[in-house]
Each structure stands twice: as C-alpha cells, then as structure tokens.
C-alpha cells in the first residue's frame, strides 16, 4: 500500500533513483495505491545527465510493493521494497529499460509496454 509521502525506488533508466508519492490518482478520497495504480511523484534523487532531474513532478505506475498483493487463486506476492516506473501523459514509460521483476496484474491494467520491457513477470 502506497500512501502520499511514501518513498519508492525507480525501476527504470529514466534517470531518477528515488521518488516520493505526492498524490494517489483515481478519486478525490482515495488514500492508498497498490500494484498497477497510477500515482503522482516528485523526483527526490536523480543521476546526472538523466532524462528527469531532481524536483520534477511526473506520473508513475507502481510495479512492486512490500505489502502483499492477493491473487484470485488465493496466493499472495510481495517484494522487499516498493518500486515504480515513471510514465508520461500517454501512459508510456519514460525510460527504455525496466529493472527487476514486475507483477502480472499490470497486464490487466493495459501497461503492455512495461510488461514487454521487464526481464521477468511474476
């Protein structure tokens, strides 16, 4: 579960290393986000000469959470750290590579570009 002010790792090569959630999109009273949800983030740490820089505000889709994600078959999957992929206004990833595994739930949310770039889909 991702709340506003939660810090997340960035799982792509957009140039950002750490981001902080500013807002959970999808309703005026929505407080938490899970895997596959879109959030608004601020870049807190970035590498030199990256596509994004510190202080930039972007949208991001959550690809890994430490809070367990329940599946229809009763199983659950969770990760050690929270991670997100930065996306543009057209819901396409800013980076050209994805690092680490992503969850299968992204396919139902129509993030096919992220699924195809990921090295592993769990």
UniProtKB/Swiss-Prot annotation:
Keywords: Ribonucleoprotein, Ribosomal protein, RNA-binding, rRNA-binding
Gene3D superfamilies: Ribosomal protein L14
Source organism (scientific name): Gluconacetobacter diazotrophicus (strain ATCC 49037 / DSM 5601 / CCUG 37298 / CIP 103539 / LMG 7603 / PAl5)
Name of the protein in its database record: Large ribosomal subunit protein uL14
Lineage of the organism: Bacteria, Pseudomonadati, Pseudomonadota, Alphaproteobacteria, Acetobacterales
Keyword RNA-binding part of the UniProt annotation: yes
SMART domains in UniProt: Ribosomal_L14
InterPro entries: Ribosomal_uL14, Ribosomal_uL14_bac-type, Ribosomal_uL14_CS, Ribosomal_uL14_sf
Signal peptide: none
PROSITE patterns: RIBOSOMAL_L14
A GO CC term assigned to this protein in UniProt: cytosolic large ribosomal subunit
Keyword presence, Iron: no
Function statement: Binds to 23S rRNA. Forms part of two intersubunit bridges in the 70S ribosome.
One of the protein's GO biological processes: translation
Cysteines paired by S-S bonds: none
């Amino acid at each position: 579960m991702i709340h506003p002010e939660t810090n997340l790792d960035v799982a792509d090569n957009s140039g950002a290393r750490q981001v902080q959630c500013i807002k959970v999109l999808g309703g005026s009273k929505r407080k938490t986000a899970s895997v596959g949800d879109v959030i608004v983030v601020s870049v807190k740490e970035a590498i030199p000469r990256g596509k994004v820089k510190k202080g930039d505000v972007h949208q991001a889709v959550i690809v890994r959470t430490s809070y367990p994600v329940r599946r229809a078959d009763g199983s659950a999957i969770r990760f050690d750290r929270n991670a997100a992929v930065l996306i543009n206004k057209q819901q396409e990833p800013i980076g050209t590579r994805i690092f680490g595994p992503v969850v299968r739930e992204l396919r139902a949310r129509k993030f096919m570009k992220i699924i195809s770039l990921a090295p592993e889909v769990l």
